[in-house]
From Swiss-Prot:
The keyword Cell membrane does not apply. This is Prefoldin subunit beta. Heterohexamer of two alpha and four beta subunits. Disulfide bonds: none annotated. Keywords: Chaperone, Cytoplasm. It comes from Aeropyrum pernix (strain ATCC 700893 / DSM 11879 / JCM 9820 / NBRC 100138 / K1).
Length: 123
C-alpha cells in the first residue's frame, strides 16, 4: 500500500513545483531580453560609424519608413533603456524565486526527514 504524504508536505511540494515553473519562465524571458539588448547595442555600435546625414530606414509593420540617424539612435536608446529596466526586474525576480525555492526545499527536507510530524508552518 502506498502511503500518502501529509497535506502540509503536499501543499509545499505543489508550491515548489509552481515556483520552479515560474522560475523557468522568468529565465527564458530574461534570455530573450538579453538577446534583444545585445542586438540593440550591436546596431547602435554600427550606427556610430555612419555620417549624420546617412539614409536609414526603419521597418514599421510591412513598410520601410525613412528616418534620420538621430531618430533611429533615439528610438534605439529608448528601447535599450526599456530592455535594461526589464532585465533588472527579471534578475530581481529570478533571485527572489531561487531563494524562495531554496527555502521551500529546505522545509520539505526537514518535514520529510522528521516524518512530517510537528513541522513548522508558515509558507
Amino acid at each position: 500500500m502506498v502511503e500518502r504524504l501529509p497535506p502540509e508536505v503536499e501543499a509545499k511540494y505543489t508550491k515548489y513545483l509552481k515556483l520552479r515553473e515560474t522560475l523557468s519562465v522568468v529565465m527564458r524571458e530574461k534570455a530573450t531580453v538579453e538577446a534583444g539588448l545585445a542586438e540593440v547595442e550591436s546596431v547602435l555600435k554600427e550606427l556610430e560609424g555612419l555620417p549624420e546625414d546617412a539614409e536609414l530606414y526603419r521597418l514599421t509593420g510591412f513598410v520601410l519608413v525613412k528616418k534620420s540617424k538621430n531618430e533611429v539612435v533615439e528610438d534605439l536608446n529608448k528601447r535599450k533603456e526599456d530592455l535594461e529596466l526589464k532585465l533588472k526586474v527579471l534578475k530581481s525576480q529570478e533571485e527572489h524565486l531561487k531563494k524562495e525555492l531554496e527555502r521551500i526545499e529546505s522545509e520539505l527536507r526537514r518535514l520529510l526527514q522528521g516524518g512530517a510530524v510537528g513541522g513548522a508552518k508558515g509558507a
